[in-house]
Amino acid sequence: MFDAHSTTILSVRRGNHVAIAGDGQVSLGQTIMKGNARKIRRLYHDQILAGFAGATADAFTLFELFEGKLEAQDGQLLRAAVEMAKEWRTDRSLRRLEAMLIVADRNNTLILSGNGDIVEPENSLAAIGSGGMYALAAARALYHNTEMDALSIAEKSLNIAADICIYTNHNIVSDELKDA
């Protein structure tokens, strides 16, 4: 696995909403190269949210590949993820990509790992990137101890992670699917 510096991505599912939030920092080694990167996207006719951690060029390659799989599978998230994982494991160039994705539709949230694995979180929260575990811990506390909505939990948790992780900043970009 790779050392995923320069990002934090968090997904929160609560009630009929799913939100994904990410910070805007891009680092090269110990240098901040950019502070306002957009690591969250909508895919397949705005029905799927996706966020990436890892090497930017690799992540865009994965976004493009995943979007193609979504089109081929008529927007079915689980089937598209399985098809992408199959290709990821058999294509030598894809196995060298250093990126991870969190993808979510109205029913499912998945983590697509850097080695072609598909992980479905056992609860309503998922995180990746260097600040992911800080954001996940904050999100768990907020999820279980407040009535905050999914988007508010995601944004607050990212801000907490940014206070702790040097590879995460406070330039938060978030999006949500309502009535998920």
From Swiss-Prot:
Keyword Protease belongs to the record: yes
Pfam family, one: Proteasome
Class in the EC hierarchy, top level: hydrolase
InterPro entries from the UniProt entry: ATP-dep_Prtase_HsIV_su, Ntn_hydrolases_N, Proteasome_sua/b, Proteasome_suB-type
Residues reported to bind Na(+): A162, C165, T168
BP terms from Gene Ontology: proteolysis involved in protein catabolic process
GO cellular component terms listed in the entry, alphabetical order: HslUV protease complex; proteasome core complex
Catalysed reaction, written as an equation: ATP-dependent cleavage of peptide bonds with broad specificity
Predominant cellular place of this UniProt entry's protein: cytoplasm
Activity regulation behaviour: Allosterically activated by HslU binding.
Keywords, sorted A to Z: Allosteric enzyme, Cytoplasm, Hydrolase, Metal-binding, Protease, Sodium, Stress response, Threonine protease
Protein EC: 3.4.25.2
Active-site residues, record numbering mapped to chain: T7
Subcellular location: Cytoplasm
Source superkingdom: Bacteria
One GO molecular-function entry: metal ion binding
PANTHER family on file: ATP-DEPENDENT PROTEASE SUBUNIT HSLV, METALLOPROTEASE TLDD
Cited function: Protease subunit of a proteasome-like degradation complex believed to be a general protein degrading machinery.
Family as reported in the entry's similarity comment: Belongs to the peptidase T1B family. HslV subfamily.
UniProt subunit comment: A double ring-shaped homohexamer of HslV is capped on each side by a ring-shaped HslU homohexamer. The assembly of the HslU/HslV complex is dependent on binding of ATP.
Protein name: ATP-dependent protease subunit HslV
Gene, per the UniProt record: hslV
